């Protein structure tokens, strides 16, 4: 996970001070950086503290992920739902975010420069060798960005779904905050 030391990973040593603020979606304290006393480092978790972000920049981490996927495919599973898949690639310079000016933090947390490289590699190394189905959860992705995940010629994922469509019945989320466009049927 993000405490791996090899390649300028997604962690910060205590001596470097607290990393730039990042909001955690599920952490009650709100901060996506969690201090780990034994390593004297912070690790990143955009969701629960028990879900450290993996460092997809590290090829050894990706190889381990592919081994795990192959293990389950060899056991006979028919496919995978890839939760919050846009978050696997991020800007690891972690620029300061003016939350008043940019309340939508999604672009800072996800859709990083190598996202589609990682997905194509995962397809090439694992999914293309099995008769399986892949479904990515792509909340807040635009239709144009969403197509990049599933376009057949890109060889990444089979399907992508968006919670915005699933939550259309919820009047408090009736409009897409990313685009300001009202939903209608």
Label the predicted regions.
Residues 1-11:
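Single conserved hydrophobic/aromatic residue that forms the stacking wall/gate
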Residues 5, 26-50, 138-160:
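Short N-terminal secondary-structure initiator segments
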Residues 38-40, 84, 100-111, 170-180:
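Active-site-proximal cap/lid insertion segments
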């Amino acid at each position: 996970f993000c405490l791996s030391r090899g390649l300028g990973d997604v962690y910060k040593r205590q001596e470097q001070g607290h990393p730039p603020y990042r909001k955690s979606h599920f952490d009650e304290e709100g901060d996506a950086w969690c201090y780990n006393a034994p390593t004297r480092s912070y690790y990143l978790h955009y969701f629960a503290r028990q879900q450290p972000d993996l460092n997809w920049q590290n090829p050894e981490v990706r190889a381990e992920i592919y081994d795990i996927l192959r293990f389950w495919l060899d056991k006979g599973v028919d496919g995978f739902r890839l939760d919050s898949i846009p978050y696997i690639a991020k800007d690891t310079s972690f620029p300061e975010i003016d939350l008043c000016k940019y309340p939508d933090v999604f672009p800072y947390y996800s859709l990083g420069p190598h996202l589609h490289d990682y997905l194509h590699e995962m397809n090439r190394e694992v999914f293309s060798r099995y008769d399986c189905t892949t479904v990515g959860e792509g909340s807040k992705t635009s239709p144009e960005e969403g197509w990049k995940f599933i376009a057949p010629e890109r060889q990444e994922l089979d399907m992508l779904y968006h919670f915005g469509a699933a939550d259309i019945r919820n009047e408090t989320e009736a409009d897409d905050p990313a685009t300001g466009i009202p939903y209608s049927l």
